[in-house]
């Protein structure tokens, strides 16, 4: 009876895994035009935010200094005093467009992520029975394996998440999260996360192996340590 109910639960799990991508793609297409119109209207009413103005002004000053240096070299200071170089105007327009696209990207992805989280939370809340059946089926499948295979899978999972090369993977994960949310990369946060999170996770896994798994199957713990120390 449990195995018959496990198949719908597995399909439900696959649906839950694929749902965020489908929702993200659909809502990105649906919300993009609406958010773009709303943002452009808001921009026309309130002009540029302070941070946006400051960043563009800094870039403008940098370009102006470069342009002045170029004009001094070419000895065309009179032309510069009468009319600013066309290149600066083009660069300013490009900066405004790029900054506007960055803000649209942040708002769009943040809205999509909130909607995905709400939908997934609703599915988890309304489908507790399927999750309970799936959890019991996975536990039954795991307990029916012999201790050597169990130790192999545990060692594989621990090395994958907290092994020697796992730091690079966690760095890619947090960079993907930042990019998906539209946040500016912060190397300090990346370094702190990569240095601390695998250590915390490794401590939790060791606690689970020593205190929880040892009560269920002491022989499994012995095999696990024998393989890991080999």
Swiss-Prot record:
Domain of life where this protein originates: Eukaryota
A biological process term (GO) from this entry: potassium ion transport
InterPro entries linked: CemA
Record carries keyword Nucleus: no
Cellular compartments annotated: Plastid, Chloroplast inner membrane
Subcellular location, principal: plastid
Keyword vocabulary terms for this entry: Antiport, Chloroplast, Hydrogen ion transport, Ion transport, Membrane, Plastid, Plastid inner membrane, Potassium, Potassium transport, Transmembrane, Transmembrane helix, Transport
Lipid bilayer topology: Multi-pass membrane protein
Keyword Cell membrane: no
Transmembrane segments: 7-27, 106-126, 145-165, 181-201
GO cellular component: chloroplast inner membrane
One GO MF term attached to the UniProt entry: proton transmembrane transporter activity
Catalytic activity as recorded in UniProt: K(+)(in) + H(+)(out) = K(+)(out) + H(+)(in)
Cited function: Contributes to K(+)/H(+) antiport activity by supporting proton efflux to control proton extrusion and homeostasis in chloroplasts in a light-dependent manner to modulate photosynthesis. Prevents excessive induction of non-photochemical quenching (NPQ) under continuous-light conditions. Indirectly promotes efficient inorganic carbon uptake into chloroplasts.
Family the entry assigns: Belongs to the CemA family.
PANTHER family on file: CHLOROPLAST ENVELOPE MEMBRANE PROTEIN (PTHR33650:SF2), CHLOROPLAST ENVELOPE MEMBRANE PROTEIN-RELATED (PTHR33650)
Name used for this protein in its record: Potassium/proton antiporter CemA
Organism phylogeny: Eukaryota, Viridiplantae, Streptophyta, Embryophyta, Tracheophyta
């Amino acid at each position: 009876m449990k195995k018959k109910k496990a198949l719908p639960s597995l399909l439900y799990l696959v649906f839950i895994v694929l749902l965020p991508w489908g929702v993200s793609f659909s809502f990105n297409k649906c919300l993009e035009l609406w958010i773009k119109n709303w943002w452009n209207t808001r921009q026309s009413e309130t002009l540029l935010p302070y941070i946006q103005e400051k960043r563009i002004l800094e870039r403008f000053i940098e370009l102006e200094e470069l342009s002045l240096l170029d004009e001094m070299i070419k000895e065309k200071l009179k032309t510069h005093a009468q009319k600013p170089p066309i290149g600066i105007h083009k660069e300013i327009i490009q900066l405004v467009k790029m900054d506007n696209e960055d803000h649209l990207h942040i708002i769009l992805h943040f809205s999509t992520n909130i909607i995905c989280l709400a939908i997934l939370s609703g599915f988890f809340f309304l489908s507790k029975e399927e999750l309970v059946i799936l959890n019991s089926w996975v536990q039954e499948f795991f307990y029916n394996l012999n201790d050597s295979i169990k130790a192999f899978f545990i060692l594989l999972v621990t090395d994958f998440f907290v092994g020697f090369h796992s730091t690079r993977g966690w760095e890619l994960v947090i960079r993907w999260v930042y990019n998906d949310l539209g946040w500016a990369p912060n190397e300090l946060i990346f370094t702190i996360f990569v240095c601390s999170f695998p250590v915390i996770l490794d401590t939790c896994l060791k606690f689970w192996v020593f205190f929880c798994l040892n009560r269920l199957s002491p022989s499994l713990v012995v095999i696990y340590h024998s393989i890991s120390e080999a």
